Structures are given as C-alpha cells and as structure tokens.
Amino acid sequence: MYTQRLLRPVSQASRFSLGPWSRAAIASRQISNYTGKAFTLNTGAQIPAIGCGTFQDKEQQEGAVLEALKAGVRLIDTARVKRKQKVANAEYSYDTEPFIGAAIQKSSIPRNEIFLTTKLWCNSFHPEDVESALEDSLRDLQTDYVDLFMLHYPCTFARGEDRFPKSEDGLMRMGETTYVDTWKALQEIMKRTGKIKAIGVSNFSQDEVENLIAAGMPPAVHQMEVHPFLSQKTFTTWHKTRGIHVQQFSPLGNMNSFYREVSWSNGRANRGRLLDEPVLHEIGAKYNKTPAQVALAWGVNHGRSVIPKSTIPWQIRQNVESVFVLDLEDVEKIDALNADLRFNTPDEAYRWPLYKGLDGV
C-alpha cells in the first residue's frame, strides 16, 4: 500500500527510485521510522510522506483532491476554518471539508487507504464544544472517523458561531478555557468514540507541546511551518527525541500568494521566492527534478511528511514524485538556505504570543 521495506544499499542506478535511503539519511538516523513511502507515528499508524494541502481555492478542491488521489496521494489535509474572512488584509479560508468528502466518495478508493486529517478551530476549544465540532467535520467529510484531529493553534477564541469573534474595538475576543483543557477533551473523545485515530497540533511552541505531554499524551503529529528558508533545526530535532512526527505546512515557503498579501508577513514574503534559489535548480538538474521536488524531498530526507498545496494537475503529479534520495552534500546545501524567515505570523491578529522561543520570531 504505502509502505515498502528498505533492503539494499543505494547504487547509482537506483538513485531515482523510492527505495533505499542514502548514506545521508543512514548516517544521521533522521528517517529511522521511514518504511518506503510513509512514516510510523507514535500510535503505530503509518502517515504518508507526501500529502495534499487544501488551503484556499475551495471551489477547486474537489477536482484537485480527486486528481491527487488518482496520482497516488493518500494523505489529505484540511481544516474547519469556515467562511472567507479578511484577516490582516488577506482572504483566510479553508471551508473545504465538504469538497474533500465529495472527492473521496467519487474516487472509489477505500477509506482505510486514505490518511485524512482535519483540525479543530479556535472558537470550538471549550471542552463542551469539541465533540460537536468533530461531528460537524465528520458530516462534511462524509466519514465515520478521521485519522488525525489537530488543534489548529494554541489560542482559544470566544465560543460561538463566529470563527473570528471580535469586540467593538476590532480585537479578537478570547476564550475562557485553555488549549490544555481542549487536549484533555480530545483524549477522552478519542478513547471513548474511536472517531479519532490520533491527535496532534499545529503552530505550537515547545513549552506549549510540553504542557500537552504533561497533560497525559504527546501529540502524534506537530504540523508546523518548515521549508528551506525556515528549517527550525533545533525544534524539529527536539520532536524526534519526544517521538513526535513533524509535518511541514507551506513546504515551498513564500510561493503561496497568501503570504505576499497578508499584512503580517508580506515584508518577509516579498523577498526572493524560494523556488528561484539557484541551489535548488542546480540540485534539481543533478537528479532530473524540479526545484519544487527538491525542496519537498529535502523535508522527507529529514524525516518529515510534507503537504504541498496545488490545484494544478501537473504540479500535483510532480509532487508525488518528490520522494527520492538526496546525497548528504545536497541536503547540507539546502540546509544552508535557512534564513529564519517565518511567514505565518498572526500573533497580533490572534492576540497570542505564537512560536515563543522559536526561530523566525
């Protein structure tokens, strides 16, 4: 299905295959939990190395997810953020769960062959609201369970239908409970209902993750912004020591136009685009791969799953072909692109000190 065992050493002839990993990976032990096209989570489940992100362009997501599934993608990531909102001068919307549910149904691919992720949005963090929010997602996704249910951010917003509740002065209204309360509720729901196979987080700091571990269970996955401009080496290495899988969102950095539009990041995002970096072109020529494929492979070679977002069929097909071995010197060349450039920084808008103590803050 997703997995294959690694049995033989790398040869020049096998360089472009999905199979055995290079001396870079073996020497660094960075992908010891890798089994071909998937990683093993601390739950024992397998998460595919390459997925499909679905942020924005909701009307195109049904076709895009169908194309991705047809191309072999088996990891689909979405979220509960609903309605198009103007946040910091840019349109912020997922609202894609119904389209993804329809695509999965039309694909005829057995549900147990798809790793489906969605997220709990911040206005549903009160423990009394978590299960109903999960049921809303399951209904729209047309499924009985999700493989991974994540806290989208550590901040809690005021309860209610409004996803971005604001006071008369325009400031976000904050909730009365904490993300730790929500985490405990998730654990209970997962154990009682079986409708969640694993729980995880997105956009948390190290201190915040440690608080979750102290609350009874480490996340299975931490989805965070990681790309060659923001490698977060110390933080991602820390996750390995805790058995928490790191998943990269925005694995192509500032290629997403959202970052060039939103006021909180456009100063940084409008620098040179990641895929214009000469080193990615040089390495791509060596392996007969595109710069995007090289950037994605860099993440996988470091032991992380990646969820690039595209609605363009040829790009989706190329993304699937991004699981290949990079030589050690090429991994190090891409590592050297790090500039601690973080593009997703809604701290002020969300009234929360996001990413405290991390690179790029």
Please place each PLM-identified region on the residue numbering.
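Short amphipathic alpha-helices and their capping/turn segments at secondary-structure boundaries
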Residues: 105, 130-149, 233-241
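Hydrophobic faces of well-ordered beta-strands that scaffold small-molecule active sites
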Residues: 48-53, 76, 88, 114-118, ...
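Short, acidic/polar
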Residues: 58-69, 126-141, 205-209
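Structural motif corresponding to the early beta-alpha repeats
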Residues: 115-128, 150-156
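N-terminal binding-site loop/beta-alpha segment at the start of enzyme catalytic domains
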Residues: 2-114, 131, 252-256, 350, ...
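Beta/alpha (TIM)-barrel catalytic core signal, keyed to glycine-rich beta->alpha loops juxtaposed to Asp/Glu
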Residues: 122, 153-361
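Alpha-helical scaffolding within the catalytic cores
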Residues: 33-39, 101-104, 134, 206-209, ...
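Active-site mouth loops of central-metabolism enzymes
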Residues: 48-59, 120-127, 171-175
